[in-house]
Curated annotation (Swiss-Prot):
One of its GO terms (cellular component) is chloroplast. Belongs to the terpene synthase family. Monomer. Induction: By herbivory, wounding or elicitor treatments in young leaves of cv. B73, but not of cv. Delprim. Induced transiently by F.graminearum and combination of jasmonic acid (JA) and ethephon (EP), an ethylene precursor. This is Acyclic sesquiterpene synthase. Its main location: cytoplasm. Pfam families: Terpene_synth, Terpene_synth_C. Substrate binds at residues 333, 337, 474, 477. Transmembrane segments: none annotated. Residues 39-71 are annotated as: Disordered.
Length: 590
């Protein structure tokens, strides 16, 4: 197994290529001190940038330089950025990518004909700029489609598969219900692409067929980043073929460098992930959590969700606590649902309320002792580490997060015992907490870089991010787990809609819930990308990452409850060596 990745001669060569593109096509000596290269040691990747109004985009080169004939077109520059992001190595080229995107954004604001007269370039620019925090409107995409005479139909693109593919990808980054143009483009492009898959007419190239098939598997928010990276690395022959058809990306050394760095980065990450997972497995045994026979053992799934989204090596602490608290919340959930008596549950809540004074209260059972001791030790260790990182005491906040979860679960138990049927509003207020994302996501915010003051934690934006993420996740879960929970005598949003909706059927209730699910997802992404923000962008991104995790497990089935549904994805991210397709057959040779 490879050791942690370092910049190699190949990746340095690739940096030179990126720098050439970011400078407008003029070759630059690697390491030259141009304005677009300057950044502080703490400056983050463009994936963590905030939404930028026009005035805040870096000036880069002079206007005269920007207007010079450029060897690389905007489309070619964006294609390079897209390749680096899809291969999971964009963070190594943050400054170069920022230059490219700043230049592209200026061209977007100026309605440059290279963007506005080319549908494929416009769609790609819209998608990449938006997801990197630039303030772009879908109205521009509407005008481009309308100007092409295809306002009511995308049929004119029937034989232009790549344009259809870019339109389809652009349609998935909606941040508002008002962006109906994206829904329309998405529906039509998806239909035409599926027709092409079925007929094979316009997809004569097997690589293009596979690329379309992969894109239609689901929107970008339904998979984990590291799984997406793996697919692109293993199917690099598809990307390489497209690069070879593109001037200034067709250099075989460039494609080889991209592949080499991507493989080293992914493989070294697996080495790290395996070590972290082994540590977590030991922790489960040390805490005696494996002795709780009633509890679902979901460590692998929680670690997959952490490594699959927070994949950078420096986020080890965040991954570890994410997985630990995921395991603990699942055990607590099972304890409240099926295993604990009312006396045991009340005892556990009281112990957490007492916290450091818990010795004044006896453990009602060994099960309570194991669960409380695991929470207590983990929270105190985490609090000590977080307090050092944040330069202030954090433990009290971590205890409050757990107490909020336990009290909301106790409310659910009391409803069940008294046979009380809550209103839909009552249910959602409580159920967004009982879904259990608080102890997983909120502590991780302290370990992704920025300082999180107490005023940030108390700000309404912080609460809104949590509410949108938790509501989206809870509704996705309810739709997929309705049958099982109904058989167990439990209420959820589906059954409440049926109960309060008169003659509404179960299938109608599930369809009706799709709108609030979509709304929460769009509103969350909008808030994450918003520039005017109290919560730092790297922290906001964790809420979005967990939203993607919820889609990953619950968008089509109850993938979390199954022991095997996502087992192959666990291996794909953590254990399984890369298997390259096409001409790149031996990873070790790259």
């Amino acid at each position: 197994m490879a050791m942690p990745v370092k910049l190699t001669p190949a990746s340095l060569s690739l940096k030179a290529v990126c720098c050439r593109f970011s400078s407008g096509g003029h070759a630059l000596r690697f390491g030259s001190s141009l304005p677009c290269w300057r950044r502080t040691p703490t400056q983050r990747s463009t994936s963590s940038s905030t939404t930028r109004p026009a005035a805040e985009v870096s000036s880069g080169k002079s206007k005269q330089h920007d207007q010079e004939a450029s060897e690389a077109t905007i489309r070619q520059q964006l294609q390079l950025v897209d390749v680096l992001e899809n291969m999971g190595i964009s963070r190594h080229f943050a400054a170069e990518i920022k230059c490219i995107l700043d230049r592209t954004y200026r061209s977007w604001l100026q309605r440059h004909e290279e963007i506005m007269l080319d549908t494929m370039t416009c769609a790609m620019a819209f998608r990449i700029l938006r997801l990197n925090g630039y303030n772009v409107s879908s109205d521009e995409l509407y005008h481009v489609v309308e100007a092409s005479g295809l306002h009511n139909s995308l049929g004119g693109y029937l034989n232009d598969t790549r344009t259809l593919l870019e339109l389809h990808k652009a349609s998935t980054v909606s941040i508002s219900e008002d962006e109906s143009i994206l829904d329309s483009i998405g529906s039509r492009s998806r239909t035409l692409l599926r027709e092409q898959l079925e007929s094979g007419g316009a997809l004569r190239k097997p690589s293009l067929f596979k690329e379309v098939e992969h894109a239609l598997d689901g929107p970008f928010y339904t998979t984990l980043d590291r799984l997406h990276h793996r697919w692109n690395i293993e199917n690099f022959n598809i990307i390489e073929q497209h690069m070879l058809e593109t001037p200034y990306l067709s250099n075989q050394h460039t494609s080889r460098d991209i592949l080499a760095l991507s493989i080293r980065d992914f493989s070294s990450s697996q080495f790290t992930y395996q070590q972290e997972l082994q540590h977590l497995e030991s922790w489960v045994k040390e805490c005696r959590l494996d002795q709780l026979q009633f509890a679902r053992q979901k460590l692998a799934y929680f670690y997959l969700s952490a490594a699959g989204t927070m994949f950078s090596p420096e986020l080890s602490d965040a991954r570890t606590l994410w997985a630990k608290n995921g395991v603990l919340t699942t055990i607590v959930d099972d304890f409240f649902d099926v295993a604990g008596s009312k006396e045991e549950l009340e005892n556990l809540v009281m112990l957490v309320e007492m916290w450091d004074e818990h010795h004044k209260v006896e453990f009602y059972s060994e099960q309570v002792e194991i669960i409380f001791s695991s929470i207590y030790d983990s929270v105190n260790q985490l609090g000590e580490k977080a307090s050092l990182v944040q330069d202030r005491s954090i433990t009290k906040h971590l205890v409050e997060i757990w107490l909020d979860l336990l009290k909301s679960m106790m409310t659910e138990v009391e409803w069940r015992l008294s046979k009380y049927v809550p209103t839909e509003k009552e249910y959602m207020i409580n159920a967004s907490l009982t879904f259990g994302l608080g102890p997983i996501v909120l502590p991780a915010l302290y370990f992704v870089g920025p300082k999180i003051s107490e005023s940030i934690v108390k700000d309404p934006e912080y609460d809104e991010l949590f509410k949108l993420m938790s509501t989206c996740g809870r509704l996705l879960n309810d739709v997929q787990t309705f049958e099982r929970e109904y058989n167990e005598g439990k209420l959820n949003s589906v059954s409440l809609l049926v109960l309060h909706g008169g003659s509404m059927s179960i299938s109608d209730a599930k369809r009706k819930l799709q709108k609030p699910i979509d709304t929460c997802r769009r509103d969350l992404l909008s808030l994450v990308l918003r520039e005017e923000s109290v919560v730092p962008r790297p922290c906001k991104e964790l809420f979005w990452k967990m939203c993607k995790v919820c889609y990953f497990f619950y968008s089509t089935t109850d993938g979390f409850s199954s022991q095997v549904e996502r087992a192959k994805e666990v291996d794909a991210v953590i254990n399984e060596p890369l298997k390259l397709q096409g001409s790149h057959t031996l990873v070790s040779d790259v």
